[in-house]
Amino acid sequence: MGDILTGVSGAEAATAMIAAAAIIALVGFTKWGAKKVASFFG
């Protein structure tokens, strides 16, 4: 993990973590929404 973060500033690392969390949340919400829509129309 340390090797990956070598040469990366704290701000860049924080931005990457926030972006990753946002993507994970978006994917999770999309899957949940798809199930709701499928059950509604099903």
Curated annotation (Swiss-Prot):
The keyword Transcription regulation is assigned to this record: no
Subcellular location: Virion; Host membrane
Descriptive protein name: Capsid protein G8P
Residue intervals on the Cytoplasmic side: 35-42
Superkingdom, natural source: Viruses
Function recorded in the entry: Self assembles to form a helical capsid wrapping up the viral genomic DNA. The capsid displays a filamentous structure with a length of 760-1950 nm and a width of 6-8 nm. The virion assembly and budding take place at the host inner membrane.
Subunit structure: Homomultimerizes. There are several thousands of this protein in the phage capsid.
Topology of the protein relative to the lipid bilayer: Single-pass membrane protein
Keywords: Capsid protein, Helical capsid protein, Host membrane, Membrane, Transmembrane, Transmembrane helix, Virion
GO cellular component assignments: helical viral capsid; host cell membrane; membrane
Membrane-crossing residue ranges in chain numbering: 13-34
Family of this protein: Belongs to the inovirus capsid protein family.
Residue numbers on the Periplasmic membrane side: 1-12
